[in-house]
């Protein structure tokens, strides 16, 4: 409202500053009749704080008990003591503790279930891994038993055949075994065998001259069941000479085969060596693929030959006498 001319309006610091800046004391609006008075808002707590009167302030400043009570009340509000007392009255603390305890129990039970499930899964996986191994072991055992049975049957058949063979066949088998075991020293073994056979023939010739019934029985026991006890000394000597000739022919054939196998193995080894040499030659670095940057990155030049380095770096007649380091 506009101030009357007879009354002196209450002027404050703000009004004085506005008048100095050119304000004429008029209000807002079209007719300029807006309020120009200062609006003061008093707080509800008149005894304490900014809105308190002077008398209240004086009384409280001297009364320390009231100030301490007010201070404690403010601290209680800030710390939430009133809420704590209210919860205790209504027994809400106990309920919340029970709820939190139940939640923790549920979480722990879920964790235990998850762990048990994971353990069961791992156990099942381990069992599934173990099962095929057991099957394989059973199969391998069955295969081994089959092989053992087949080997036993073959051994029994071979033993029966050996029993039926004559002494000439046994001697030939022994000579064959000796020749196969001594294939590497064939020349020496042949000479020794010939000497032994000559000695045996001489002994048998002497025994044939002084043959008797007892000698015939001993010779029949040493020979197989197929050889007859009534065979004469001449027939024995002829059969032995025939067996000796056969053994010699067999030994010769085996020696030839061993020599051929040795020659073939030597030729194959020489061919393999030639192929290795060719492969080594192929591994040499081609100059078209190499670059100068690879030489700069390389820690040593030993990977390249002298010719490769000259082709990469270019021919330099002034530095031709210099020897480059190559592979050792």
From Swiss-Prot:
What terms describe the molecular function in GO for this protein? nucleic acid binding
List all Acidic residues biased stretches. 116-126
The region called Disordered is annotated at 97-291
Give start-end positions of Basic residues composition bias. 101-110, 248-257
The residue ranges of the G-patch domain are: 10-55
Cellular component terms, GO, for this chain's entry? Answer: nucleolus
Here the segments flagged for biased composition (Low complexity) are: 141-158, 210-240
Designated name of the protein = Uncharacterized G-patch domain protein DDB_G0278987
Q: Which organism is it from?
A: Dictyostelium discoideum (Social amoeba)
Write the lineage as a comma-separated list. Answer: Eukaryota, Amoebozoa, Evosea, Eumycetozoa, Dictyostelia
């Amino acid at each position: 409202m506009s101030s009357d001319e007879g009354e002196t309006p209450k002027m404050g610091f703000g009004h004085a500053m506005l008048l100095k800046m050119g304000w004429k004391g008029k209000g807002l609006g079209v007719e300029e009749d807006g309020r120009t008075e200062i609006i003061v808002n008093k707080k509800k707590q008149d005894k304490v704080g900014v809105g308190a009167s002077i008398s209240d302030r004086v009384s409280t400043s001297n009364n320390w008990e009231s100030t301490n009570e007010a201070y404690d009340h403010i601290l209680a509000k800030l710390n939430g003591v009133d809420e704590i007392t209210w919860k205790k009255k209504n027994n809400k603390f106990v309920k919340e503790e029970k709820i939190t305890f139940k939640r923790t129990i549920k979480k722990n039970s879920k964790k235990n279930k998850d762990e048990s499930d994971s353990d069961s899964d791992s156990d099942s996986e381990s069992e599934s891994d173990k099962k095929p191994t057991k099957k394989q072991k059973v199969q391998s055992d069955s295969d081994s038993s089959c092989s053992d049975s087949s080997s036993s049957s073959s051994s029994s058949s071979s033993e029966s055949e050996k029993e039926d063979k004559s002494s000439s066949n046994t001697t030939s088998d022994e000579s064959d075994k000796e020749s196969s075991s001594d294939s590497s020293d064939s020349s020496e073994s042949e000479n020794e065998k010939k000497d032994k056979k000559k000695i045996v023939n001489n002994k048998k010739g002497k025994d044939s001259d002084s043959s008797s019934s007892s000698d015939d029985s001993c010779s029949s026991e040493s020979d197989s069941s197929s050889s007859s006890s009534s065979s004469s000394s001449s027939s024995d000597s002829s059969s032995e000479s025939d067996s000796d000739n056969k053994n010699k022919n067999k030994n010769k054939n085996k020696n030839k085969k061993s020599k051929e196998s040795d020659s073939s193995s030597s030729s194959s080894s020489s061919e393999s060596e030639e192929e290795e040499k060719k492969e080594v030659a192929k591994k040499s670095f081609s100059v078209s693929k190499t670059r100068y940057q690879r030489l700069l990155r390389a820690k040593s030049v030993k990977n390249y030959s002298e010719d490769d380095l000259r082709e990469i770096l270019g021919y330099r007649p002034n530095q031709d006498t210099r020897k480059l380091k190559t592979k050792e």
